[in-house]
Amino acid sequence: MISKDHRMLGELLAKQLIKNTSPLATHLFVTGCVFPDHNPLTYIRGLCMGHPFKTHFLFLSYPEIQRLCSKLENRKRLYIWDYYTLGALTHYVADAFTYPHNEHYTGSMLDHTKYEHDQLHRVFEQYLTKDFQAAGYVNDDMKPLGEFFSE
């Protein structure tokens, strides 16, 4: 996914799930959704593991997903920085559901980039904007994310 798509997804999820929190919490969540694509350390990790262009593939990012989950488990409430962690977790999980981030993908990095920019981005623009909202998937009845941690 391209950064713009991670941002759109983050903003939609924030609108639906991060209600009644500070604007800073929303900003940190959306930043977490985007930042892994801009963090050079994530690419160095892939290079060190012998997969320089597969850094966000599920088989390489799974340990990071586990690490982020372990930071959040057993929480009674969310602290401000946890929103960034949730955003980063969302980034890796979203990437894991895209074809070029799957270990069965055999295309080149150029094919990967072309797919994300041409095909996937068009789908995200269509479904995460007007069509998604018009279909009734966006509503005000969803439980705010913070309530899951206060039960």
Model-derived features: positions:
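N-terminal membrane-targeting hydrophobic helices
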Residues: 1-151
